[in-house]
Amino acid sequence: MSSALYKQSTNFTHSTGSFLQSAPVELTTVSGYQEFLKKQEKKNYEIQTVLSEDKSHGYVLKDGEVIANIIGEAKDYLLDLAGQA
């Protein structure tokens, strides 16, 4: 005989899925950054890429909300484009 130690309601699953869709993604490679931008353009989203003041990371914004964090190689690529590497 088996007994459930934990039961997950369907509301929890839906809520978690909704949260994961709204959580910012992390972009670390140039190809990942470029692919992400292409997907946003296909959806006709108006997006903006912004570097932090200390240039330690960047963000992709949609309607003023962070939808992606940019670090690593992708951040270095943006600094090169801006002539600030």
From Swiss-Prot:
<keyword id="KW-0963">Cytoplasm</keyword>
<keyword id="KW-0539">Nucleus</keyword>
<dbReference type="GO" id="GO:0005737">
    <property type="term" value="C:cytoplasm"/>
</dbReference>
<keyword id="KW-0597">Phosphoprotein</keyword>
<protein>
    <recommendedName>
        <fullName>Uncharacterized protein YBR085C-A</fullName>
    </recommendedName>
</protein>
<feature type="modified residue" description="Phosphoserine">
    <location>
        <position position="22"/>
    </location>
</feature>
<dbReference type="GO" id="GO:0005634">
    <property type="term" value="C:nucleus"/>
</dbReference>
